[in-house]
Amino acid sequence: MKEIKDFERIKIKIASPDQIRNWSYGEVKKSETINYRTLRPEKDGLFCERIFGTTKEWECYCGKFKSVRYKGIICDRCNVEVTHFKVRRERMGHIELAAPVAHIWYYKYIPSRIGLLLDITASSLNSILYYEKYVVIEPGDTDLKKMQLLNEDEYIEARERYGMSFNASMGAEAIKTLLENLDLDELSSKLRIQMIDKDDKTDKKLLRRLEIIENFKISGNKPEWMIMEVLPVIPPEIRPMVQLDGGRFATSDLNDLYRRVINRNNRLRKLLLLNAPEIIVRNEKRMLQESVDSLFDNSHKRKVVKGSSSRPLKSLSDALKGKQGRFRQNLLGKRVDYSGRSVIVVGPELKLHQCGLPAKMALELFKPFVIRRLIESEAVFNIKRAKNLIEQEVDEVWQILDLVIKEHPILLNRAPTLHRLGIQAFEPVLVEGKAIKLHPLVCHAYNADFDGDQMAVHVPLTPAAQAESWALMLSTNNLLNPANGHPIVFPSQDIVLGLYYLTMEKKNVIGEGKKFLNFNNVILAINNRSLDYNASIYVKIDGEYKKTTAGRVIFNEALPKGIEFVNKTLSDLELQILISKVYVVHGSSTVIEMLDIIKELGFRYATKFGCTISMSDIIVPDEKRTYVERANKEIAKIQNDYAKGVITGEERYNNVVSVWLKTNEELTNKMMEILKKDRDGFNVIYMMADSGARGSRNQIRQLAGMRGLMAKTSGDIIELPIISNFKEGLSVIEFFISTNGARKGLADTALKTADAGYLTRRLVDIAQDVVVRIEDCGTINGIKVETVKNGEEILESLKEKAVGSYSIERIKNPITGEIVLDANEEISEAKIELLEKIGIEKLVIRSVLTCEAEHGVCQKCYGRDFSKNKPVNIGEAVGIIAAQSIGQPGTQLTMRTFHIGGVAQAGSEDDKISLKNAFILNGIEGFNVRVDNGILFTRKGTLKIINVFYEEKIKNIKEIKVLDSQRVIKGIPLFIDKKGSEILSSYIGYVKLRDDNFFIVSEEQEVSLKAGTKLEIEVGDYVESGKVIGTFDPFAEPIIAEVKGKIKFKDIILGTTLKEEINTETGNVEKRITDNVFESLDPRIFIIDSSGMEVASYVLPGDAYLQVEDGQSINIGDIIAKLSKGSEKTQDITGGLPRVNDLFETRIPKNLTEMAKVSGIVQFKSIQKGKRLINILDEYGVEHKHYIPAGKHLLVRDGDVVKAGDMLCDGRINPHDVLEILGGISLQEFLLAEIQDVYRKQGVSINDKHIGVIIKQMMKKVKIVAVGDTNFVYGQKVDKHTFYEQNRKVIKQGGEPAIASPILIGVTKTSLNIDSFISAASFQETTKVLTDASIAGKIDDLRGLKENVVIGHLIPTGTGMGLYKKIKVSENIDSEV
């Protein structure tokens, strides 16, 4: 057998006829397979031993040579070589075709490759290949044109007219001749000139033709090789034929397909010898073409070839394609030996690094090891006897098994493996029974529970694999979540409840208020039953008495030494914070020790507490009735407003929903308050929810409050709430609505899980070759990071954003001038605290987005590896980790809907504006008008405010030590008070002395306001925290008059642009502007002053409700028309996941906004073809046209000044526009913020760098906009590094470099355009990828992980990297000894 040497790259090309003959060991001439009597292969048939090798080991066909000593001899009687039968897996044959045929991949797939080369349509090409039309090859001196198609009649007429002076023919021969006659160089230069002439308007077809021609030129393939004269026959063992029990045969479909080809080929050869009539020969040639098509790709044909049971036969292409194809089924997903699976049960007695392995299972898994030890110990002398002993399960076997599994790690895996923590290594401990025992704390990483989950066990065999399992995969080495660095091994459920109970405080119990000298005395008192666990006591700690509880003393006593005293009630979050803290301060070994102690304590005290739930624990607030009655009154008022026509139907619906959401929230707060007070906080239901052990506020609300609003199948909220709770019981209608919601939850879960899985698969595919390859790429670019706030609320602190990254710039202390952080220094937790102390709120850090490493990323730009809390190692597969970090929560979140049972969750909008902090209003921006009691914003506006952190009356100050407007940081002396004490600053901010007050304030911040907001404060006012400063309508956007005058309608015509609807419920007439767009009509409202001049004009969008009449007088601040907000939808990741999908696929949103391309002045123009033309006049007086659909609500008015990137109308932002108008960095920030927003709303924390890795891959390519002297084609999309490389070469030779613009490509498209053709082919569209790769003669450098898995190499990451392979261990002996 041929041995494949270790290789570094793979090339794919089109096989030439000579190459196919070269591969072959002989021609297959007959379609027979096996002789039915002898069951031996037929000579010259599809299984012929002379061609493909012997079926019996070291024996020829006739039996003349029978032994390994004749190896390599070819028998003189039967011509069969004496060799191993395994050669039948690798020897190929061939079929000499009687007529050329085209390869289906190159002519049938869109775009047809042969069609592009010859510039003929796919249908014309088909008609030539299937012998329906002639094509003119050489017109000679006739009127015919080259490549002209002629049907039978036209051909006969031309022959009669011109005789033999022209050459025309049909079938694959004709196409072959045309392809042979092509001059690729000449064609290429001709097309390039055409491309330059076309300039801006890139012709896609031209670009495709040029790319194919260039590919043929570079690869050395000849176009005529796409037409086949010789057909390869794959080795027989790959298309086997096996005998079944009943004497019948099962055979691979390929044999049938080959048989058809051979039969038709032989028949055609015979017909040609007999000089049969042309029409018969032609028909046979067409049939031969069809049979070869079926062999290569049966599913792509219109009429598929079916087998005996009328199912389509599986062709060569089908064997590669899809989930069941060769790539995904056999190369990327293999079944492995030395593995087993069983149900899991909890193992509370295990240590964190252990798992319980059933003895029977272990014996089977480690059988070969046991056999070897049995033979070594001379208990038996051969394998057969050893097997017998094992089957009898004698004592020696168990003793040896104990020795074998000692320190031999095993891997446990639970499907679905969504992230790398889905496979971890453990030390096996033998257990009775048949279930695998799992440590309770690793359940979270596996997402396992014990309701019948199964897990698979794998045994690492080689010492290297075992070493990796111990060092890298052991559960104790995987304490942190790679997605965000938070602990992933933490207690939950019973353990949390036990510790919560242990550390709670209770009034009036035995031993309350006693003092103890040390911990031992406390434990003694408890054991003597003279002290209650929850009693409040005083204990001497570090020389002073501390108030604590007996339970907390027990908890702290059990913790490893060196951890400071924990003096609080422990909930699940508190425990996670504690674990994080201990990990940072003391390292992983202390954490591991602590976790096992916590587990022990939690289970013990949960058992001692022995909590139960009864109906009396579910307390329904007495105030419930009052709340519900109040809500009903509010709703009656809303209905009344609706009846009067004050509000629209949509506003009524939104208001009703809002009232119920608010009522439910208030009732829940009241209920939780009552539960908290019940039994001094020892109400079991409250304890379970508050500790985070089980259940949530939302679930208790349904038990004791009210179920609340439910969602319809469509996601809309049903405005009738379920007022009952489960304790009171539901009415029939309430029960029915409930089932509706519950069913939606389950259906969503099933559908969305598949979506999230597919998202992960696409992300893995795009990022799988991103590996940390170098230490430092030397870039000087970085990204700005700052605290993410929503108004005043901090969503993500600077610490979360920047910790573990490297700084780009040097940062000095603004006061002392000393360097706090150097350039290229890692930003540690300590550094961040220092920076926050001196008031640094923004940083420029190195990021994967700006990394300039040629392949993958560098160590410095990536920063910290969160799973280890250390700088990332070279060789880390950061791309896959990124994909898993984003995909895994996607899958988790989709499963979250069904626990709440479809209860609607939507933020209830408030109509009042108040801020959490006290502040001073510095200024206002945006269009506003003065009304009698305040300021009314007629469009969106902004408040400029400064938050007040600290205030003191100046009369209480003796001496001020700082200046007005001076920046202060924590610890700086501010003033000396009247008592003579020096007061230090506890804040970072600016001093503001105003009137008789001393303030410390923040930098100026902006607060956005909606149109129609009424502000009740003035500029310069000091406003206390929580005070209402303005009101607005959350459910409608008004169009407000900015001047006084008379209303004049323009193009508002009843029946065309205006629709009058009589509301059936209220009997009122509602006037609504229609969605219909008319070229000549542009519905507007003018305001005319007393002199008859038009002083204002308002464009009315579709669906606006008119609030005024023609000719009516109007005052400043009156509402002209209203736009209703769409009805509330429930928010959960079911809405979020499709959004993430759209962002990663860079889809253009449906309801699209138009962004200003430049900064300048807005000019309204006419409506053309249903779109409104808006010009923006830039500073140079150049007009830039923007077209906006006519019915859209405009956010600008005639004459407004806008900045580039401002939204001109409402709608969603198109990421491609952001790239074009604001550039690459803005786009990266936009995508990052949008994706993070979806996850953050779900409470999922993913570090920016993971999303950054994916965005980097999406922006890998650039589009050529000027060719220069390079070989690029105008409009071509190329890799950034290829582009820079080519330009470098051209500049070196003194030529003109190419110019390119950045582009954004979605993840699916990027995966298909990836450099590695093996990776792309195993993702999607396998045959298309392979077709293009073969034409281009692509070389796969085997850089990524996927391609190496496919070809069976070690993956080039971690210990598989070349860097680590060269390490040698040497012994260094000191020569002096």
From Swiss-Prot:
Its EC number is 2.7.7.6. GO terms for cellular component: DNA-directed RNA polymerase complex. The keyword Transcription applies. Zn(2+) 2 binds at C777, C851, C858, C861. Keywords: DNA-directed RNA polymerase, Magnesium, Metal-binding, Nucleotidyltransferase, Transcription, Transferase, Zinc. One of its GO terms (biological process) is DNA-templated transcription. It is an enzyme of class 2 (transferase). Its cofactor is Mg(2+); Zn(2+). Belongs to the RNA polymerase beta' chain family. The RNAP catalytic core consists of 2 alpha, 1 beta, 1 beta' and 1 omega subunit. When a sigma factor is associated with the core the holoenzyme is formed, which can initiate transcription. This is DNA-directed RNA polymerase subunit beta'. It comes from Borreliella burgdorferi (strain ZS7) (Borrelia burgdorferi). The gene is rpoC.
